[in-house]
């Protein structure tokens, strides 16, 4: 047997529903998940991050403090993950940390993206080298800096002569189109995933998320509101494209609801679920009329979402990535362990056709624990 090649992946998405930490062995043809752990984000830290995502005065001090605090949180996730295994830290080659996105503005004249969670702090508090800051090289090369996971999807999920679409539904939803032949792999953000659904149930019922989509399923979707929301210019943009809370946030939702105050809250929640499903389905149906659709991320656990989506993509067999041997909950964490592995071996990790970068490149920087 070949010697294990252990990397850890750390991911916290726009939904901010926890830090996923995964331990992965890359010594085989396909990555092997050894262990996974989700570290809850403490309420005081979550509030600070949510405030930082909205433009305001005195951001620099808050940014600096939160950068260190998120770094410590990510380190806690790694240490808790390793407590679940018998693998010593000395055997871990590196941690791949996504960080926490607080701004993603790739379409400005000088585009930028900003993830916090100081990798120096993670390295010091875990004793393991950290590879981080994966997105900014792609932006420096004229790309969107996102999505980065399609290169990983291509390596792990592509199958000759089969059209496959990998759909990740986190706060934002993104798709990877794997044509199964010499055609170009494509990938982009379709729009909101769980971000608006989560925000609205938190505001109304003080619940972090709509479990299994039950609240949305108790309401009736409003066609006029859905049509209005789907008229957002982002949905008609051609890829490469990426988005985030900067476009689809509480303020945007309040604007959309201004003329719909007569609607019951559960009807609005049902319409928000439809917004996610319709924006995803519209893009998938444009990519190819039929194929296999594999879903991962938090949205894969939402039964109402999966049911509605199935109805909107009749040409597709819909399953989660677990059917391909990769647990739907941990796909993004594994992807960032993979990105760290690519950096360690000096291999490129972005797909210019996906991000719009001028060339493929080695992504991220290494922060030594020594």
UniProtKB/Swiss-Prot annotation:
It is an enzyme of class 2 (transferase). InterPro entries: Anhydro_N_Ac-Mur_kinase, ATPase_NBD. CDD domains: ASKHA_NBD_ANMK. GO terms for molecular function: ATP binding; kinase activity; phosphotransferase activity, alcohol group as acceptor. It catalyses: 1,6-anhydro-N-acetyl-beta-muramate + ATP + H2O = N-acetyl-D-muramate 6-phosphate + ADP + H(+). ATP binds at residues 13-20. Its EC number is 2.7.1.170. Pathway: Amino-sugar metabolism; 1,6-anhydro-N-acetylmuramate degradation; Cell wall biogenesis; peptidoglycan recycling. Keywords: ATP-binding, Carbohydrate metabolism, Kinase, Nucleotide-binding, Transferase. GO terms for biological process: 1,6-anhydro-N-acetyl-beta-muramic acid catabolic process; amino sugar metabolic process; peptidoglycan turnover. PANTHER family: ANHYDRO-N-ACETYLMURAMIC ACID KINASE. Belongs to the anhydro-N-acetylmuramic acid kinase family. Catalyzes the specific phosphorylation of 1,6-anhydro-N-acetylmuramic acid (anhMurNAc) with the simultaneous cleavage of the 1,6-anhydro ring, generating MurNAc-6-P. Is required for the utilization of anhMurNAc either imported from the medium or derived from its own cell wall murein, and thus plays a role in cell wall recycling. This is Anhydro-N-acetylmuramic acid kinase. It comes from Shewanella denitrificans (strain OS217 / ATCC BAA-1090 / DSM 15013).
């Amino acid at each position: 047997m070949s010697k294990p090649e252990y990397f850890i992946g750390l991911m916290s998405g726009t939904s901010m529903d926890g830090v996923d930490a995964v331990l992965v062995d890359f010594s085989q043809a396909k990555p092997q998940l050894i262990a996974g752990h989700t570290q809850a984000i403490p309420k005081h830290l979550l509030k600070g991050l949510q405030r930082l995502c909205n433009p305001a005065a005195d951001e620099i001090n808050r940014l600096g403090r939160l950068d260190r605090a998120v770094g410590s949180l990510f380190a806690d996730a790694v240490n808790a993950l390793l407590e679940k295994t018998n693998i010593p830290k000395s055997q871990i080659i590196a941690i791949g940390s996504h960080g926490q996105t607080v701004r993603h503005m790739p379409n400005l004249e000088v585009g930028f993206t900003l993830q916090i969670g100081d990798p120096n702090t993670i390295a010091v508090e875990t004793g393991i080298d950290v590879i981080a800051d994966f997105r900014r090289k792609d932006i420096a090369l004229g790309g969107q800096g996102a999505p980065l996971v399609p290169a990983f999807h291509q390596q792990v999920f592509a199958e000759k002569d089969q059209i496959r679409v990998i759909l990740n539904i986190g706060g934002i939803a993104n798709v990877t189109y794997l044509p199964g032949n010499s055609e170009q792999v494509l990938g982009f953000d379709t729009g909101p995933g769980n971000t608006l659904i989560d925000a609205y149930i938190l505001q109304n019922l003080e619940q972090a998320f709509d479990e299994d989509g039950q609240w949305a399923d108790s309401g009736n979707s409003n066609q006029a509101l859905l049509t209005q929301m789907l008229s957002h210019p982002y949905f008609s943009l051609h890829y490469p494209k990426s988005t985030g809370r900067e476009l689809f946030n509480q303020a945007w939702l309040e604007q959309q609801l201004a003329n719909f105050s007569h609607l019951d809250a559960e009807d609005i929640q049902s319409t928000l679920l439809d917004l996610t499903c319709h924006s995803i389905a519209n893009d998938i149906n444009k990519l190819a009329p039929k194929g296999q659709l594999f879903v991962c991320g938090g949205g894969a656990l939402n039964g109402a979402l999966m049911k509605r989506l199935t109805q909107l993509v009749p040409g597709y067999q819909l399953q989660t990535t677990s059917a391909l041997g990769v647990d739907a909950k941990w796909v993004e964490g594994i992807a960032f362990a993979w990105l760290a592995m690519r950096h360690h071996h000096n291999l490129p990790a972005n797909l210019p056709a996906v991000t719009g970068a001028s060339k493929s490149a080695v992504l991220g920087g290494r922060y030594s624990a020594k």
